[in-house]
């Protein structure tokens, strides 16, 4: 008989609850000086030696015999071939998911705007897509085609001219679903490179890999470290932490459903976090029993158990109002409101990457095909960050057009402020445009 899981139990009424909650939520990515130095060395090599460095690192890290960079380029025809190599059901699922993701993100598009003042001055904002975006996709059999859709489609909807995907093929392992997803999502170019060297190539460009304006997509510690180092040279989406789910339940949902919802994030990796908050203590016991019952049936039981025991929790609260307070304190990546009337509580939710409303809305639907993006802020960063979206691939420029009368009137204000800052060139630049009949100073 399998031993019961050791998931921690917390009670919001305990005087030291805040301390225990802080301890539960604390997570720091591995800080490894040796990794940092290796990444810096790799970036330096790619900047100095370009394609030659990429070929060398691919041979070294991916175990491939590569004669030249030409061996690391996948033509569009190869992506189209992948569509024929997956099952009909898989292709239909990818196409349906892509259509829903595209439809949702179309609603996020921002348009340029302007307005004209009485004197003819025009002020506005010009929205422009990035020229080129780079998408990092983890390689091998563990890569996720859904991530290709979630990263590439918003870029294409935004109007990005070229989306460049990098995906390693360790020991020659090619994930046909990933390539098929790239084809459906409209990825323009694909290079079978990975690791810090791929991030460096996207950020600085090589003879074959074009330089991009922004790098998005998940990866291991080498990829994350490389993204930190190239930020500023290019934009990045985020440095993501472990996956998280917080379920707020009134105690009326099937406990097996809730246990499986917790598993859906815990199975990602040992550092993933799954938390249930409820005012019903007996319900927490029922979910604990469901966890013990269902865990042995899971393909990734060992990973789930490590995650649940190490970073999971069942939290008892006074009432639903306190449950919402705890949710806002945690600011989770995924928040399920598994309650009778989720709409009533929605206005009180301030911090969450994605909010799943009602008992029938499992987090897994958002991961794959609901439509909203599954690239979400983690580790409490939902306090100030948002899901990946079309706006991440667009930039805004301010538009200012001054009529003669407008320049004259604004010039008087600018002159006073500039001289107050002892910036006389600023002042005189504005003063030159003040009409003669109103100067007099």
From Swiss-Prot:
GO aspect biological process, one term: L-histidine biosynthetic process
Protein name: Histidinol dehydrogenase
HAMAP family associated with the record: HisD
Residues forming the catalytic site: 333-334
Binding site for substrate: 243, 265, 268, 334, 367, 421, 426
Reaction(s) the record says it catalyses: L-histidinol + 2 NAD(+) + H2O = L-histidine + 2 NADH + 3 H(+)
Pathway: Amino-acid biosynthesis; L-histidine biosynthesis; L-histidine from 5-phospho-alpha-D-ribose 1-diphosphate: step 9/9
GO cellular component: cytosol
Annotated keywords: Amino-acid biosynthesis, Histidine biosynthesis, Metal-binding, NAD, Oxidoreductase, Zinc
Cofactor requirements of the protein: Zn(2+)
């Amino acid at each position: 008989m399998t031993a019961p899981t050791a998931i921690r139990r917390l009670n919001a009424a305990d005087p030291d609850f805040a301390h225990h909650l802080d301890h539960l939520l604390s997570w720091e990515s591995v800080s490894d000086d040796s990794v940092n130095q290796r990444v810096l060395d790799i970036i330096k090599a790619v900047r100095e030696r370009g394609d030659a460095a990429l070929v060398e690192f691919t041979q070294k890290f991916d175990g491939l015999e590569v004669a030249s960079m030409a061996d690391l380029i996948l033509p569009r025809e190869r992506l189209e071939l992948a569509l024929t190599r997956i099952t009909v059901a898989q292709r239909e699922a990818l196409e349906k998911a892509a259509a829903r993701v595209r439809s949702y993100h179309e609603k996020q598009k921002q348009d340029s705007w302007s307005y004209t003042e009485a004197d003819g001055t025009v002020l506005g904002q010009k929205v422009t897509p990035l020229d080129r975006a780079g998408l990092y996709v983890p390689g091998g059999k563990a890569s996720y085609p859904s991530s290709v859709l979630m990263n590439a489609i918003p870029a294409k909807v935004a109007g990005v001219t070229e989306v460049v995907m990098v995906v390693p093929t360790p020991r020659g392992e090619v994930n046909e679903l990933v390539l098929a997803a790239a084809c459906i999502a409209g990825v323009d170019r694909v290079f079978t490179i990975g690791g810090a060297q791929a991030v460096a190539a996207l950020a600085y460009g090589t003879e074959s890999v074009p330089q991009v304006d922004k790098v998005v997509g998940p990866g291991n510690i080498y990829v994350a470290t490389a993204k930190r180092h190239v930020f500023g040279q290019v934009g990045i989406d985020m440095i993501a932490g472990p996956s998280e789910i917080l379920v707020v339940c009134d105690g009326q949902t099937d406990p097996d459903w809730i246990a499986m919802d917790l598993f859906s994030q815990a199975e990602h990796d040992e550092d993933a976090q799954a938390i249930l908050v409820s005012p019903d203590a007996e319900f927490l016991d029922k979910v604990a029993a469901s966890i013990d019952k269902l865990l042995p049936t899971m393909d990734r039981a060992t990973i789930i158990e490590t995650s649940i025991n190490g970073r999971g929790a069942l939290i008892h609260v006074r009432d639903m109002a306190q449950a919402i307070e705890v949710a806002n304190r945690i600011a989770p990546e995924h928040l399920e409101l598994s309650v009778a009337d989720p709409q009533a509580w929605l206005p009180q939710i301030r911090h969450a990457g994605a909010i799943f409303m009602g008992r029938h809305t499992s987090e897994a639907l958002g991961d794959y095909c609901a439509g909203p993006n599954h690239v979400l802020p983690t580790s409490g960063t939902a306090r100030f960050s948002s899901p990946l979206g079309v706006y991440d691939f667009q930039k805004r420029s301010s538009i200012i057009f001054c009529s003669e009368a407008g320049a004259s009137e604004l010039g008087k204000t600018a002159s006073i402020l500039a001289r107050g800052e002892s910036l006389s060139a600023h002042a005189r630049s504005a003063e030159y445009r003040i009409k003669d009949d109103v100067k007099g100073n």
